[in-house]
Every structure is written in C-alpha cells, then in structure tokens.
C-alpha cells in the first residue's frame, strides 16, 4: 500500500516533520528547565530548546503557505495571512535586534573622538541601533520579495506586516511610549509606501529593476515616518547624520536584497506573474 505521508495535501509533509520537531523541542525544553532553570531575559530567545521549538513551529505554520505557493496562489487571504503569521513568529525571536523594541534614535548618543578610551563603548548603542534597522528591514522586505517574485503584491501586504510586527513589539515592551509612537509612525509610513508601490507597479518597470526599486520604495517611507513620529512624540538623541543615514542605508539594503532576488531563474519569477495578478479563490 501507499505510505501514509503520500496522502497528505501538498505542502503539509514538512508540517508533519514540524510536529515531531516541536514535540522533541518540548521534551528538551522541559529537561533544560529542570536542570538549568528558567530563562528570564534575552537568553530565553536563544535557548537551544526554544530554538528547536521555533523550528518546529515554523515548519507547522508554513504548511498552508507552502501548499498555496505550490499551486501558484500567492495572493489569496490564506497565503497572505500565513506569510504575515510566519513573519510575526520570526520577528518575535528577533526582538533583541528589532528597531521596533529599541527605538534607537531616541537613545542617548555621545560622540567621542577616535583614540579616546571610551570611543568604542560610546558608539555601541548607536551601532547596535543601526544593526537593528538593517535586520528589521530584512525582516520586512524578504516576505515582500518572495511575493513580488511570483506576482504583484496585493495592496495592504506591507501595511499588514509593518503593523503586525511593530505593534506586537510594542506590546512586548509594555507599550513603552517610544515603541507605541514609533509603531504608529511606521504604520503610517507603510500606508504612504503602499501608494508608491502601486504607482511603481503601474509604471511597468524593467524586470531587473522592478524588485530592487519596489523594495527600496517600501522601506524608505516606512522608516522616514517612523523616525519623524519619534522626533515629534519623544525626541531624537541621534544627530541628523545618524538617523538620516539609517533611512538611506536601510533603503540601499532593501534594494540589494531585491537585486539578489533578480538572479533567480526567470521562469520562477516572471512566468506566474501574469497569471497571479488577480487573487485566486
């Protein structure tokens, strides 16, 4: 007879693997806590047993998404909802490097000259903040790029991702004022970016430019409004070179990620596009 796993719907095989991984992770986590105690801070996000649970959960949550994408349906509510849910899960495990929890431009900045004994230490908060901008940029842009490779992203996808990640991050830090203000600004920026994305998609950009340009256009307004909201609602400590540079370098990083996507086989990128402009039922 046929093996049981061959009866699974397309895309759900790895979900079954995820169930096993999650179960093993739960047992490992219980043993870890009994022997080493319970984590209380950032170490909880890096605990090996928690990372096993994360891996299993990721495999489970992406089952419906893999199934939809396998059929060429990347813009239905199920596919978009699955993509947003997976992105939220990844963002939770990256909270320690998220701009939405750090609100880095509001943190104290003290510039000390090269050669000063405290020069490196004084710049650590700013460099960590810049890294947070870049990592959060990748977190937002990668799901968009995966969608753009296969279809025109539906309106509202960027706003959904930004709102979900930013407001969940604000909730994790007990609705800290800076986090709430930053989330509101980023969400408004994403709405503005949606208009730019829609306009650019109607310009029929050259294939090699389309995704890099769209990626930059998604990120620059989002971070610009995020920082503008922080400036108005909390106040910035970073000098203009830092906060403006954070926006520019994030836009460049987004475009670079989009450029890497262009190197994918043409059949995988362009063939489904015309067929997927209108969401499938």
Feature-to-residue mapping (PLM):
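Cytoplasm-facing juxtamembrane segments at the starts of transmembrane helices
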Residues: 10-17, 72-87, 148-164, 205-217
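Hydrophobic alpha-helical membrane segments
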Residues: 18-26, 186-193, 209-230, 248-252
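Aromatic-anchored segments of alpha-helical transmembrane domains
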Residues: 22-30, 85-95, 161-173, 216-229
């Amino acid at each position: 007879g046929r093996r049981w796993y061959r009866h699974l719907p397309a895309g759900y095989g790895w979900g079954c693997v995820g169930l096993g991984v999650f179960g093993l992770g739960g047992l490992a986590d219980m043993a870890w806590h009994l022997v080493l105690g319970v984590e209380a801070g950032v170490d909880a996000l890096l605990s090996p047993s928690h990372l096993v649970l994360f891996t299993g959960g990721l495999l489970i949550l992406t089952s419906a998404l893999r199934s939809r994408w396998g059929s060429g349906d990347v813009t239905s509510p199920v596919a978009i909802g699955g993509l947003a849910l997976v992105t939220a899960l990844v963002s939770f495990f990256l909270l320690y490097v998220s701009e939405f929890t750090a609100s880095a431009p509001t943190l104290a900045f003290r510039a000390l000259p090269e050669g000063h004994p405290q020069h490196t230490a004084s710049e650590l908060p700013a460099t960590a903040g810049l890294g947070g901008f870049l990592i959060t940029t990748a977190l937002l842009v990668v799901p968009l790029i995966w969608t753009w490779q296969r279809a025109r992203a539906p309106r509202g996808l960027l706003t959904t991702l930004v709102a979900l990640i930013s407001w969940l991050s604000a909730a994790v830090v007990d609705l800290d004022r800076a986090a709430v203000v930053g989330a509101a600004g980023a969400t408004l920026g994403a709405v503005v970016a949606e208009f730019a994305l829609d306009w650019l998609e109607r310009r029929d950009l050259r294939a090699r430019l389309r995704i890099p340009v769209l990626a930059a256009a998604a990120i620059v307004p989002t971070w610009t409004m995020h920082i503008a909201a922080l400036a108005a609602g909390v106040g910035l400590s970073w000098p203009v070179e830092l906060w403006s540079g954070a926006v520019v370098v994030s836009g460049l990083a987004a475009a670079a990620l989009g450029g890497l996507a262009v190197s994918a086989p043409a059949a995988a990128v362009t063939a489904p596009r015309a067929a997927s402009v209108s969401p499938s039922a």
